[in-house]
Amino acid sequence: MTEPSAATTSLVSDFNIKKILELLPHRYPMLLVDRVLEMEPRKRIKAIKNVTFNEPFFNGHFPGHPVMPGVLMLEALAQTAALLTFGESNHKRQENQLYLFVSIDGARFKRQVTPGDQLVLNAELLRSKSGMWKFKVFATVDDEVAAEAEIMCAVREDKSKGDA
């Protein structure tokens, strides 16, 4: 992915955890994005997940050798992509909307992620149409790729809202 010029990159110092909680329905233990560092609306986003030993998945993955599950790296990347989708003023997530995984292609896990690592999450919008969004995503630790994939997500109505 090419780096945009400083003039086109939006440095989002106010895009902290409060803003993330406004845009994503995820909560502990499934909220996997801590802060957005950069966002270029409708193009790309860069965020972070600080990985600590206190993550609940480290209890069993693996005792004595804690490693962040690859599927959770992909989930963190999907949440980052959702922030790019809903971080625009003209496409805010409504209370009755869900952001769902539709597909994952070419997923590769290239580096173990362990407690103390800072996972840098990147998503680039490839295309969007009719509530479907396709992204190239990758996560790095210390500038080394840990995971990469192409993902497709969809915005759909949450039909469970209002059901008892």
Swiss-Prot record:
Catalytic residues (positions): H61
CDD domains recorded: FabZ
One GO cellular component term: membrane
InterPro entries reported for this sequence: FabA_FabZ (IPR013114), FabZ (IPR010084), HotDog_dom_sf (IPR029069)
EC number annotated for this UniProt entry: 4.2.1.59
GO biological processes: fatty acid biosynthetic process; lipid A biosynthetic process
Reaction equations catalysed: a (3R)-hydroxyacyl-[ACP] = a (2E)-enoyl-[ACP] + H2O
GO molecular function: (3R)-hydroxyacyl-[acyl-carrier-protein] dehydratase activity
Location relative to the cell: Cytoplasm
Keyword terms, alphabetized: Cytoplasm, Lipid A biosynthesis, Lipid biosynthesis, Lipid metabolism, Lyase
Pfam families recorded: FabA
Family the UniProt entry places it in: Belongs to the thioester dehydratase family. FabZ subfamily.
Role according to the record: Involved in unsaturated fatty acids biosynthesis. Catalyzes the dehydration of short chain beta-hydroxyacyl-ACPs and long chain saturated and unsaturated beta-hydroxyacyl-ACPs.
NCBIfam families: fabZ, PRK00006.1
Record protein name field: 3-hydroxyacyl-[acyl-carrier-protein] dehydratase FabZ
Organism: Ralstonia nicotianae (strain ATCC BAA-1114 / GMI1000)
Lineage, top ranks: Bacteria, Pseudomonadati, Pseudomonadota, Betaproteobacteria, Burkholderiales
